[in-house]
Amino acid sequence: MVSELELKEIIGKVLKEMAVEGKTEGQAVTETKKTSESHIEDGIIDDITKEDLREIVELKNATNKEEFLKYKRKTPARLGISRAGSRYTTHTMLRLRADHAAAQDAVLSSVNEDFLKANNLFIVKSRCEDKDQYITRPDLGRRLDEESVKTLKEKCVQNPTVQVFVADGLSSTAIEANIEDCLPALLNGLKSYGISVGTPFFAKLARVGLADDVSEVLGAEVTCVLIGERPGLATAESMSAYITYKGYVGIPEAKRTVVSNIHVKGTPAAEAGAHIAHIIKKVLDAKASGQDLKL
């Protein structure tokens, strides 16, 4: 049986050995820290949203990568993404979150007023007071407020053959990305057809149906609104043109002709402008739009 004195001696030896080992390990760690140097580079982190998903296959063991890419190039859908266990890989998750954030920004942000001035567009607005009301009350987004009605009557040509205007809709980003190329191409195209055009302007917090109110206020034969579309994970920059012949408040949606997917990976803005002008010419010739127009 170990006596109390022997037990104290054993414990003392163990503590001394632990102290020596701890000191040695601490020195080793310290030496390691001294020899390792952190390397920090100045610069800008690459924007992950600039990668073209149609050119990326994340599957590590793809049997025929080139053949799979042929399918991917035909769609913006997220095909061929990889997983870590049951979860997305870090790259895939970051891209999803980045695209979702871009979509949120497109809806909740506003078009820069300096941008509108640079494109000679004065501002009117719907009856919505803010973005929250715009999202929850679509009916108010379809009507002009009283001040805007007065502004249009003062600044715009009355009874134009075609009234073209721009609206933020659900994507302010789409307007800033496409209008500089699309609007001039559209106006020049109409001019080349000898069609008179009213005074372009910008409508804030507007829905597609606001074009009907504009048509009644200005007496336009054809109304065309270039509006930002609801963004998604594929793109936050998609714009559409809604064309209506002799629109009025309450007109059925089926009476509108639509040119959609106007963005850099869809129909290019300048090309879309020329195409819209051609469609408007057909609308005027047929005196009809929407399902009544045979293209």
From Swiss-Prot:
Q: State the protein's name.
A: Ethanolamine ammonia-lyase small subunit
- Recite the UniProt cofactor note for this protein: Binds between the large and small subunits.
Source domain of life is Bacteria
- Tell me one Pfam family matched here: EutC
Role noted for this protein: Catalyzes the deamination of various vicinal amino-alcohols to oxo compounds. Allows this organism to utilize ethanolamine as the sole source of nitrogen and carbon in the presence of external vitamin B12.
Q: Which GO terms describe its biological process?
A: amino acid metabolic process; ethanolamine catabolic process
Q: Name one GO cellular component term.
A: ethanolamine degradation polyhedral organelle
Q: Pathway, according to UniProt?
A: Amine and polyamine degradation; ethanolamine degradation
What are the entry keywords?
Bacterial microcompartment, Cobalamin, Cobalt, Lyase
Q: What class of enzyme is it?
A: lyase
**Subunit structure, briefly?**
The basic unit is a heterodimer which dimerizes to form tetramers. The heterotetramers trimerize; 6 large subunits form a core ring with 6 small subunits projecting outwards.
Which cofactors does the annotated protein need, by name?
A: adenosylcob(III)alamin
Its localization reads: Bacterial microcompartment
Q: Which reaction does it catalyse?
A: ethanolamine = acetaldehyde + NH4(+)
Would I find Lyase among this entry's keywords? yes
